[in-house]
Amino acid sequence: MNQSYFNLLGNITWLWMNSSLHKEWSCELLARNVIPAIENEQYMLLIDNGIPIAYCSWADLNLETEVKYIKDINSLTPEEWQSGDRRWIIDWVAPFGHSQLLYKKMCQKYPDMIVRSIRFYPKQKELGKIAYFKGGKLDKKTAKKRFDTYQEELATALKNEFNFIKK
């Protein structure tokens, strides 16, 4: 680890401290969510005039790890961050209103990707939904088809995981 690693970790931590959602989270959770992203270079940090303004990280999961993640968003091990090709946003931190800029930059960097995230409702942090985002060059029809395929595979895996019985 070098000085730039610690500067990066400090910038991301500062954004977490300024996020109404993240500032309540533990240092252990920060380490679990941020260090693998840095080590695998699976993050984007936006800086304006030397000040960090937005950050996101992602993991590329296989279906099995995806099922595990859906059941417990804090379950990822460092090795699982690069276990497959099913991209999930792990963190999205834009406490100063730069979420659209971060989204635009991600769409430019990954123009052909489908990316999913678990979004939480501010007043009901235990309640979330799966959202998906498409890269800038992916048309809506193709993106929807790909997303529907991912969702069908995930639903089947979850059904098998929980041994649901069809009535």
From Swiss-Prot:
Q: Which reaction does it catalyse?
A: a fatty acyl-[ACP] + L-lysyl-[protein] = N(6)-(fatty acyl)-L-lysyl-[protein] + holo-[ACP] + H(+)
Q: Where in the cell is it found?
A: Cytoplasm
Q: Which domain of life is it from?
A: Bacteria
Q: Does the keyword Acyltransferase apply?
A: yes
Task: Give the residues annotated as active site.
Answer: H22, D91
A GO term (biological process) for this protein?
Answer: toxin metabolic process
GO function terms (MF aspect): acyltransferase activity
Q: Does the keyword Cytoplasm apply?
A: yes
Q: Which InterPro entries match?
A: RTX_toxin-activating_protC_bac
EC annotation?
2.3.1.-
Q: Which GO terms describe its cellular component?
A: cytoplasm
Q: Which UniProt keywords apply?
A: Acyltransferase, Cytolysis, Cytoplasm, Hemolysis, Transferase
What is the recorded function of this protein according to its Swiss-Prot or TrEMBL entry?
Answer: Involved in fatty acylation of the protoxin (LktA) at two internal lysine residues, thereby converting it to the active toxin.
| Family classification | Belongs to the RTX toxin acyltransferase family.
The identity of this protein, by name, is: Leukotoxin-activating lysine-acyltransferase LktC serotype A1
Which organism is this protein's natural source?
A: Mannheimia haemolytica (Pasteurella haemolytica)
